[in-house]
Amino acid sequence: MLRVSVLRREGTPEWLLRRRVRAVGRKLARAGVRRVIWPESFPYGEILGEEGVFPVETLALWQGLAAKLAWRALEARGIPAGEERVAVCADHLTAAVRQTVETLLRRCRRVSLDAPDPEGAFARQLWRSLGAALLTGEAGADVRLLFSRRPERPGDIPLYPGARGPDVPLRLPKKWEERIPTGVRRDQLIAALLAAGRLPAAEIAFDSA
């Protein structure tokens, strides 16, 4: 992993620090680097963005963990097993949406889909493969997974482009934890490892709710 540092001494004026960050951004852009892992609480992302350097995208990471996020939320709320109801809200049946619905149905029989054609080919496929029927709409759901924008309510888990990622601590096996540098955005680092095929998704877990 390549690490880039910006010199900051006690008393370094803010204008100078911002200029140094911009210079680093330009060097990264000239080198063809477009995605980086930010430090925690990094306040200079806008400056890097102006130079064409952006944070590692974490959307695919969180969408891939959607079913696990739902189980975690249900457990935290004390919803009894067998009584939980989860709604998946989406404008399109993407691969991530389909995988999430299928994963949910393997454990929960009260899964609803708020999406175009919720009783169409996808629902019939699930009935044939799992013997499970999708509910429609999202009324009465204990947890809503929002793959597309909806008017939000308490307890929703936003997973659409532009949404802030869930505030959930991610945990990896010890062999990985020992190699993660301190002071970096863990979600961005894990997303980068996942996208590069270095980290199996099954090894990503959450700290206790």
Where are the predicted features?
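Metallocofactor- and cofactor-centric catalytic cores in central/energy metabolism, strongly enriched
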Residues: 1-46
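Adenosine-phosphate binding glycine-rich loop
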Residues: 6, 158-209
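Structural motif
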Residues: 7-9, 38-41, 89-92, 113-117, ...
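Structural alpha-beta junctions
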Residues: 26-35, 48-57, 104-115, 125-136, ...
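Gly/Ser/Thr-rich loops at beta-strand to alpha-helix junctions
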Residues: 38-45, 59-64, 90-97, 116-120
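A glycine-rich, Thr/Ser-enriched phosphate-binding loop motif common to dinucleotide/cofactor-binding enzymes
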Residues: 54-72
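Glycine-rich phosphate/diphosphate-binding loop of Rossmann-like nucleotide-binding domains
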Residues: 77-140
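Short, well-ordered secondary-structure micro-motifs within conserved domains or adaptor modules
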Residues: 136-168
